[in-house]
């Protein structure tokens, strides 16, 4: 926990100037608060006894001024602390988002999207509440606590000793409850993350849910998660509800002892009635902050639990990093060479078993094989989305591990099977391939991708909103925009991962024409399901269980009569049956 406080403070450090000003405001506001009981003591001790009207008027005005100044200082304190909290949260969100952009693909494959989203939203929001509200309260109540204690010592040090009786008990109680509150708060954040994950998953699959008529099933699933969250929330609420009364009871014992012993002192003439009343007001001032601090302490445990979840993400190892002496890869010609490459997703189970291949600049290398044969893994290894266990991958003689990831991926364009577009306009999505591109270049890329015609027919042309993940477009339209985006990037190396397999025959023909334009003059790796799209490939590689079992041109492999030939015959037969 100490480490969490320390790390959280590292985000506050840049705003130390404002924090000091906020603390000064807190001190002055608390000082005004502490001044009022002293004025009341003066009323009882001097004004009522001496019937001093001038002093009464002065004290009355002083009380008004004290509360006015208290309000001014409280405003400054709350505004400054809110500013600090908001800036810290911006910095934390930026840090975690920056980290997420650098984490390996495998990190996201092992976690639900909603859980990752919850780190950036729910956990950071819990941290914000802790900083903006409860840190302010902790500062204010601590100042009142210390100030009241100091005034009590000045008034009657023997009576003050009675208040110290409860300090060890309060400290022990808050320590016990604090540990349990942190644990339940951590569970609460996990349950909220579970709800976010389920919600994200259900909304993404709403068509599937409707098609299988599983609305009631999903409602039941959500209800169970909601109930689990309720149970976690109530466990935390139970502890919070218990903490304040326990601390308040201990404080009441102290006040009763003060009243009993202080009353005897007044009766014996060792203490004035005004001093006792002032002392009791300060004692109440002492007990109230202790009671409020117990609640604040519990809420801060929630913020710390959320912070630890966030810091766990920030501490996640970046498995794929640039070498200390990594160089920027220059513009390449496109020679890609894999030598005895081995790779495994799970330790001890090789997904790629010593593969070697070479693509000359401008060549088209097609990779075919059954599902799970390792085709897409090869596509992920070339841009270094994963690191190989042994062997080497070289581009124009540069080992891809010896150059920066950014300079490597700038040379590679990828058109995946599942097209990913962003919520925005057609123009913005194509421009994503090159943020510095001109309007003329964007239109030219769209024309090359056979997309300009349908874009021009849209209500707002290139400024048409396409919806989340391009939901307002057809599959073929989405794919052509993705191709236009790749054309605009103008990479020397292309990876097409079954780019047309999900399209109907008509859409496939249009998209294939666009792909043919895209492939000209570029080294390309085409992962294909439909063999008709790779007939013109310079080399066709057939994979099976992570190994290359055949390689050659289309005609050579047909003549060989092996796996490729059988796949081709099967697809030809299916095509004839469809016709």
PLM region descriptions:
Residues 315, 322, 329-579:
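ABC-type nucleotide-binding domain
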Residues 51-54, 151-165, 235-308, 313-314:
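Helix-loop-helix
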Residues 2-16, 116:
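A short amphipathic helical element positioned immediately N-terminal to and/or at the very start
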Residues 13, 24, 32, 36, ...:
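Hydrophobic alpha-helical transmembrane segments of ABC transporter permease domains
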Residues 1, 24-25, 32-41, 45, ...:
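Juxtamembrane helix-loop junctions of ABC transporter transmembrane domains
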């Amino acid at each position: 926990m100490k480490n969490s406080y320390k790390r959280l403070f590292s985000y506050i450090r840049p705003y130390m100037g404002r924090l000091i000003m906020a603390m000064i405001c807190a001190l002055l506001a608390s000082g005004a608060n502490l001044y009022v009981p002293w004025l009341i003591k003066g009323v009882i001790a001097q004004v009522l006894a001496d019937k001093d009207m001038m002093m009464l008027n002065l004290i009355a005005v002083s009380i008004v001024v004290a509360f006015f100044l208290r309000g001014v200082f409280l405003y400054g304190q709350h505004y400054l602390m809110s500013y600090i909290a908001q800036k810290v949260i911006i910095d934390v969100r930026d840090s975690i988002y920056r980290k997420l952009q650098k984490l390996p693909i495998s990190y996201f494959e092992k976690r639900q999207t909603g859980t990752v989203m919850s780190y950036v939203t729910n956990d950071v929001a819990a941290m914000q509440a802790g900083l903006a509200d409860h840190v302010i309260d902790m500062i204010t109540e601590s100042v009142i606590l210390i100030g009241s204690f100091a005034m009590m010592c000045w008034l009657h040090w023997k009576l003050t000793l009675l208040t110290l009786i409860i300090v060890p008990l309060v400290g022990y109680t808050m320590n016990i409850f604090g540990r349990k509150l942190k644990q339940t708060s951590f569970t609460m954040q996990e349950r909220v993350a579970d709800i976010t994950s389920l919600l994200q998953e259900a909304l993404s699959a709403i068509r599937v849910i409707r098609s299988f008529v599983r609305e009631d099933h999903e409602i039941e699933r959500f209800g169970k998660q909601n109930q689990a969250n309720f149970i976690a929330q109530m466990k935390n609420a139970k502890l919070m509800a218990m903490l304040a009364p326990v601390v308040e009871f201990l404080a009441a014992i102290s006040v009763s002892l003060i009243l009993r012993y202080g009353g005897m002192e007044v009766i014996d003439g060792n203490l004035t009635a005004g001093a006792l009343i002032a002392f009791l007001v300060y004692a109440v001032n002492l007990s109230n902050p202790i009671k409020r601090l117990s609640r604040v302490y519990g809420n801060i445990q929630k913020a710390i639990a959320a912070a630890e979840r966030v810091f766990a993400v920030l501490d996640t190892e970046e498995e794929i990093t640039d070498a200390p002496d990594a160089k920027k890869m220059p513009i390449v010609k496109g020679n890609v060479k894999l030598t005895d490459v081995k790779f495994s997703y799970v330790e001890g189970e090789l997904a790629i078993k010593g593969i070697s291949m070479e693509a000359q600049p401008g060549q088209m290398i097609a990779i075919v094989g059954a599902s799970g044969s390792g085709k897409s893994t090869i596509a992920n290894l070339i841009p270094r989305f994963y690191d190989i266990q042994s062997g080497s991958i070289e581009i124009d003689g540069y080992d891809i591990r010896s150059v920066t990831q950014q300079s490597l991926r700038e040379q590679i364009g990828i058109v995946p099977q599942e097209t990913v577009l962003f919520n925005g306009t057609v123009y913005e999505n194509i421009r994503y391939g090159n943020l510095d591109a001109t309007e003329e270049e964007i239109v030219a890329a769209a024309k090359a991708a056979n997309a300009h015609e349908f874009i021009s027919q849209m209500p707002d042309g290139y400024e048409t909103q396409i919806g989340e993940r391009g939901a307002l477009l057809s599959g073929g339209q989405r794919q052509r925009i993705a191709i236009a985006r790749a054309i605009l990037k103008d990479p020397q190396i292309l990876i097409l991962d079954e780019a047309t397999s999900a399209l109907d025959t008509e859409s496939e023909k249009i998209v294939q024409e666009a792909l043919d334009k895209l492939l000209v003059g570029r080294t390309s790796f085409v992962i294909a399901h439909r063999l008709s799209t790779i007939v013109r490939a310079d080399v066709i590689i057939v994979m099976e269980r992570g190994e290359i079992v055949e390689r050659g041109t289309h005609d050579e492999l047909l003549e060989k009569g092996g796996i490729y030939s059988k796949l081709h015959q099967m697809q030809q037969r299916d095509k004839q049956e469809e016709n």
